[in-house]
Amino acid sequence: MDEKAAYFEHFPSLAGRTNRISYMDHTDHNPVKEHLMNEMMRTDLDLAILHHHGYFDTEYLNGTAPIRTVREAKEFIIRNVRMHVEEARERGRNYDSLRVVLEKRFDLPSTWLDDNPLADSLRIADSTLVANEDLHLEDFKIFGYRPNVPVVVIDACFCGSFHQDDCIANEYIFQPGSTVAVIANTVNALQDKWHDRFIGLTAQGGCVGDVVRFSNLLESHVIGDPTFRFAPVPGSVDVDGLLLQNKVSSWKKLLKSPLPDVQSLAIEQLR
């Protein structure tokens, strides 16, 4: 995985150490929500980077599960017809006349709609299925979701919309778990932006705020404590000390640093 190779450059101390970087593909499970929550509640993770689409109240995790059998195809069609029926009901349409229209439009056998699509049991089942595809604000309470990863990067639109009454990033911070800082986007985020730029500084004595400060992405913000830092790895360069002194001579020496993040920071400070 290319991204994993990049993280070994950000955090070279992890090279040769097994099981230090884990990866979850959203297509591994459908729905993946509970698997993701279980991973995020582990107490042995330091950093999580989440790639998905988002809104201020939602992490979009899954779409419709791939259809592999004829039965699944039939269930998918009937479920979508029920959605049409529900939307029409809200507009005051008559079900019997609508049924005739839908059977003709989608070339459906009349027996497929024998069950009452407006039955509460079916509506609840459909709503539950859709809700489980994504992670919502209320899921933190419903599932007792308490993230324990100290630093979380949410590479998605809107999840850091702090101007709303609540947002996904807020919930990561204010749960009883151990998450201290979340880097998230207030508005739309470019899909090709450099989401992990300078993330390696967190292993060199840099604080989370440094990552956002030097990334220059207008939509990204730290929700939580921007001064949070990890204990630096042995032989680190003490990023915060260098920034405090801000000596040109020191930055020039670091232009030859074997650490890409430190070398990039030196270029940033000298330009």
Predicted segments, located by residue:
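Cysteine-dependent hydrolase recognition
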Residues: 1-271
